[in-house]
From Swiss-Prot:
UniProt superkingdom: Eukaryota
Cross-referenced InterPro entries: Clp_N_dom_sf (IPR036628)
Protein name as annotated: ATP-dependent Clp protease ATP-binding subunit CLPT3, chloroplastic
Region (Disordered): 185-214, 278-303
Organism: Chlamydomonas reinhardtii
Length: 303
């Protein structure tokens, strides 16, 4: 239909198709340059800081305590607070606790439970729900993705817990970046209302900016506690600029060799025992111990 309505100008049908494709490629490059100009040049994924890795594991544990199979933004918040011990009282979690008047992970979880009506952990199937059964919700993955983008924009060497909190509290810079992306997506939908609308349909949910509900209840909690969000944002940005959290300093090959050696040792110990004396949880416990000692767990991947 498009070819039938297009002017011939002495061109053959093949030449018309070539011109249309070239025009589409030019428009695509123009849009790509607009996105890069607004969001910056894409960089490789940044590593997670030791505190952030611990927070992701703690988020799964908090989901279990709330009888949830999916860890959302609120569980990320609880995970950051639960992992505050790694900051020696000087990290992002400690700053947030101080702003909340000493509110720790347990008190915040109780408040969240009151808002959602959650209760103690329930039985799932034939056994208790375990942290390894919990997955991150799409909203939590979106928060983590925005935190990584914020860390890249700041020139940070890793994704820290302060980046997570900045996103969860709806910091201005993060919202502006998301809004800019939404404007580009909206422009693309309008420009391609003829061909693109028929081929793709409506814009996918991943292109839409997150609603306040997608960021969890941290903003509501700060309002209830009477916290100055601007002052808190300044403190978190100062931690981010200072690089208060660093990626785990470890060699990947050495780490893998250490994990293999540990699990091999556990296997030999269990084989040496009589079958009725073997510990079925030995490998799981060894895996947890090595994960805490070496940094991010493979299950912590969110993409």
């Amino acid at each position: 239909m498009l070819l039938a309505n297009a002017p011939h100008n002495g061109c053959s049908r093949l030449q018309q198709v070539t011109l249309l494709r070239a025009s589409g490629a030019k428009l695509h490059r123009k849009r790509a340059l607009t996105v890069v100009a607004r969001t910056g040049t894409p960089q490789p994924r940044l590593p997670l800081s030791t505190q952030t890795s611990a927070s992701l594991r703690a988020a799964r544990e908090q989901a279990v305590l709330q009888s949830l199979l999916f860890a959302g933004p609120d569980q990320l918040l609880l995970g950051v607070l639960a992992g505050s011990r790694l900051g020696n009282g000087k990290g992002a979690a400690a700053v947030l606790e101080a702003e909340l008047g000493g509110g720790d992970c347990d008190s915040v979880r109780e408040w969240l439970n009151e808002q959602s009506g959650s209760t103690a952990a329930k039985l799932q199937g034939s056994g208790w729900l375990r942290p390894s059964d919990v997955e991150f919700s799409p909203a939590a993955r979106r928060v983590l993705s925005l935190a990584e983008a914020g860390a890249e924009a700041m020139g940070s060497s890793s994704v820290g817990t302060y980046h997570l909190l900045l996103v969860l509290m709806g910091a201005g810079g993060e919202q502006q970046a998301v809004q800019a992306g939404a404007e580009v997506a909206s422009t693309e939908q309008v420009d391609g209302s003829g061909m693109a609308a028929n081929s793709r349909g409506s814009t996918s949910g991943s292109e839409q900016p997150p609603r306040d509900s997608d960021l969890g209840l941290l903003r509501s909690l700060l309002d209830v506690a009477g916290v100055d969000r601007t002052a808190l944002e300044v403190k978190l940005l100062a931690l981010a600029e200072a690089g208060a959290e660093m990626p785990p300093a470890q060699d990947s090959q050495a780490t893998a060799a250490g994990v293999v050696a540990t699990l091999t040792s556990v296997y030999r110990q269990q084989v040496a025992r009589a079958w009725h004396e073997r510990d079925d949880n030995a490998f799981r416990q060894a895996h947890q111990n090595t994960a805490m000692a070496t940094g991010p767990d493979p299950d912590d991947e969110y993409e």
